[in-house]
């Protein structure tokens, strides 16, 4: 596609003479620009892309998209106050609107997105509906797997990944849709056929400012699904009604406590998994899963209702298939080589931590205790730090450590967390490896140890460097040293 065709009708001001030059790529990284590319001068937390516009030109950029006009640049400039949405518009057009060629399923919610998307993908694949996946752990485009750290990729990458899925003959894509991605316009010009709500609890107030704005961002996804599509809602979520009100498409519901189209009853929890009865219409079907905890029953229900309502497949067959599914990496990931069970989990919000600890508390032997290693990420929502401490304090003994401190001093983050404790039933160890070592050293055979906050992540982010660090690997190394 040439530049003149791409910019025709675009929602932005165009400066400079637009010529029919071939567009080869769109990118935010000036170092990756080559001849024929459009450079997206995005302003991030650490760097301003406008500072690298000259570098992009030197590398061969034929146009620059920005929120700021630069009169000293002799190149086509595409200017708009909402650069992320412009990036989405240009990228979707350049890649010929790939989401319209896929059955696009978006999953939003504070917690559970990764588990639900992985379950839906596994089920679709089992029904010979090959699907792609865009999520926190990885992006599966078909044959290729990409790990870039984004829950929802940047607009140019999102459209590029979707186009790759089309080329690799995927029928569907299941994607995590973050509140930030919705509020910023990152998923604009993406056509959603199905939207799924897991739950809405406190998170990302550093970005959204207020909880009401955060809820509104989540609810936006359901307004993007056309009447020909479908929305799937957890009716037990306190903010389900706001999402339902936003919907133009038919609503499918699931839940445990309240009335729903797909409902789980008779839930039995154990260390080996969960048993429950699925109630759908007149059908009552006994189910089992290796997933642990009541909160995971919600995740299972979200996947079951989405796939069953989409494919209209045999429900009993679907339940057999989901019963064989395993949790994603870093989601209550067990290490059973020591004297007591150790679990690695990504829980990094108060609600997620509460859900995990509720599930583990029910598995505790008499006289046992929960030992929880956790911290909070730097440069992120500070309001949840005290709340995280209060959650852990209700269930067991806390070992407070660093998570991904980013630009903040780890000691400052830990001190803010500890302001939330009412008692002195906690221990501070800033070094995460030493914190894990300490927790394992004090655990008895009747205890359960939870290493929370990082899950699948194999790194720690500090102010000036990112270092290799894997919670599960660290646990295994420490336990092996005891032998």
Curated annotation (Swiss-Prot):
Chain sites annotated for binding ATP: 109-115
Modification comment: Carboxylation is probably crucial for Mg(2+) binding and, consequently, for the gamma-phosphate positioning of ATP.
Residues that, per the record, bind meso-2,6-diaminopimelate: 380, 403-406, 453, 457
Alphabetical list of SUPFAM superfamilies matching this protein: MurD-like peptide ligases, catalytic domain, MurD-like peptide ligases, peptide-binding domain, MurE/MurF N-terminal domain
The reaction(s) this protein catalyses: UDP-N-acetyl-alpha-D-muramoyl-L-alanyl-D-glutamate + meso-2,6-diaminopimelate + ATP = UDP-N-acetyl-alpha-D-muramoyl-L-alanyl-gamma-D-glutamyl-meso-2,6-diaminopimelate + ADP + phosphate + H(+)
Pathway(s) the chain acts in: Cell wall biogenesis; peptidoglycan biosynthesis
The UniProt record lists the keyword Cell division: yes
Modification sites for N6-carboxylysine: 218
Chain residues that bind UDP-N-acetyl-alpha-D-muramoyl-L-alanyl-D-glutamate: 30, 151-152, 178, 186
Listed GO CC annotations: cytoplasm
Residue window of motif Meso-diaminopimelate recognition motif: 403-406
Main EC class the enzyme belongs to: ligase
Stated name of the protein: UDP-N-acetylmuramoyl-L-alanyl-D-glutamate--2,6-diaminopimelate ligase
